[in-house]
Amino acid sequence: MTSVKLLKKPLKFRFSVRKSDRSQSKVSIVGAAVCALALLPSCGDDSVGQSSESFSTMADVHTNPEVIASTAEIDQLLIEQDPNGNWMASIFDSDSVLLERGSGALPAISQSGATSPGMRSAYYGDLHVHTEYSFDGYAMGTQATPYDAYRFARGEAITNPGGFDMQLSRPLDFYAVTDHAMFLGLAKASAETVTDFSKNSFATPYHGLNDADNYGTGFVSMMRRLATFAGFLPNAVSGIRSGEIDRDEVLGVIRSAWEDIIVAADEFNDPGNFTTFVAYEYTASTMDMGNLHRNVIFKGSDKLPREPFSRFHSVNPEDLWNWMDGLRAMGVESMSIPHNSNGSNGQMFKLEDWAGNPLDDAYAEQRMRNEPVVEITQVKGTSETHPLLSNRDEFAGFEIMPYRVATNALSALNGSYVREALLNGLSLEQSGVTNPYKFGFIGSSDTHSGAAAIEEDNYVSKLGLLSSEAAQRGSVPYTGLDAQTFYWGSRVLAMTNPSPRGGAAYSKVNGEVYINGATPTFGASGLAAAWAEENTRESLYEAFRRKEVFATSGPRIKVRFFAGADLDQTMLETADGIDRAYAQGVTMGGDVALSKEDTRAPKFLIMASADPSSAPLQRLQVIKGWINAMGETREEVIDVACAGGATVDSKTRRCPDNGAFVDISTCAINPETGAAQLSTLWSDPDFDPSVRSFYYARVIENPTCRWSTWDAIRAGVDPRPDLAKTLQERAWSSPINVIPAEG
């Protein structure tokens, strides 16, 4: 008899609207107005009654003529929306004054930590978390403080703006609050009338935004949030540039919030048990909303800048690196981690610098010095690759979010995905230029409620009040009068008040009204994982720096990846095998440098373990990229180990179907078809010692229910037909590069 496994209890959280909001009518026109003025992250139009619509959430939207035409219209609106250049303005001078704190000094690695590399443990965490100090988080109803965020990461329950508890099934090992540096804390200071800044006339429209009588999903509350999100940033910039708002007073608010973030990180940092990092998000973008966001992570907290460097110091990421280099010269070590390259419209990994010059050694060396790691997966999609870039990779369509961040305009593919960047880095090396794209991989969440939403059956997205109900997440339809008002109201507003964020916010799928655009494409992802001697700032940071890190889409899959000509099968079988692999090879993030005397093909030692709370593993893969004899980039996906001891097909280089299934009515799975562990010693049969190449491991689970299917089950409705019902969670190791001998 086939056994089934319910991954987790289907009712992980409760929905209970606050009493103060129950008296408010959910007048559905709110959704339309919210979309038109950009409160929702994305808005788009769909044809009525189709199961696969023009604004599909699938990866094929880049070939859809209607979406392409809409993108052209949005691009024109983006050009017209900011005639005074407020969005790209620099309104603050770069500041390098340090806070000398002393108490935040890094402890030495303890005697109880690992004494050899082989004893390193895998630690899991999130380096991308927003709280009430982020302007958008506060506008979405978030009142979680940095202290609340750290309590959540340690396993405690905190309250979602929708009124229900959020709690992880297991605590995390490390966490970093990364609030937006741009106007850090200013939305909160404007809204809360006990602050001095709230006395400014600029702040008056935002007074009491998150007071108890204006807290919920009702009409009045949502309209005020609309005004905050749509007008806050441009009005603040315009006010500072005109002199209406005192620049120094704003800097005072920013510095006060920054100090509180630092204090919270130090208060919850518990070396050996739970690690926090002082951090923030640098939220730059191009005029057409090409995403250039980075999270800046500080190694310690004994010396820190008195204010974070934001887009309002400069929108040029190279200026951020200059600032970081300057701090490094004063003894302040940090790194920046790019994220959501998928929404960068080709800007994150382009082949020219900010000024339009070809990339050179100086650019590459500075970028790698400051950005050794990239965030490859998070709630706003996975940035590994895209089916149109990797058409022979049948797993390339995983949790694709195809739009630029905060718009419904398509994001260009070239320059936006990590695997292509790795390949372009090889091409640059081949031409004699230092590789600027030689990075390690992590995942993180980008939650805006203080709570990482990384579990499919426990997912409430990232948008606070705007995603606290399943219909707001796009997984279940609106019904009755709500549905008709949302649907037709959004169309009227889209026609009468075109928004650079996109068109109508709601669409019909098989006759049912759903939220449209990017929100349904969001995923319950991801986690950063590091192989470190112990759970301390110093040990974890050094793991990030040497790129001995890996990413997961949420489950705590574990993966090791080594390369070296002298690795052997016994390393998989003996107690000292890992120590010997470290001694005789390199691990993820490293280089295999061939010499004229030794051009032997490296062997790859790969080990993966399933998360006991998730599904078993289905397959272990190696992704290879290289430059061929014609100087062209090539890639290949190779299955190297299969669940159940099955053999990889020598022609297709794929594992056979292992019979894994999901019961969509209950989300039950058949766990006996998968593996708790997969490991192999693999050699590339096509290895050419004369070419540049990279390899990384990808671990694929058996299928499980996507979060949207869990939502549908709870609501007692069928899963949304244009969303994937299941997915295959995964992990990615950082790459290992193979460098040919010179001459």
Where does each model-flagged region fall?
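N-terminal secretory signal peptides that target proteins for export/translocation
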Residues: 1-24
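Low-complexity, serine/threonine/proline-enriched polar segments
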Residues: 202-239, 649-654, 664-667
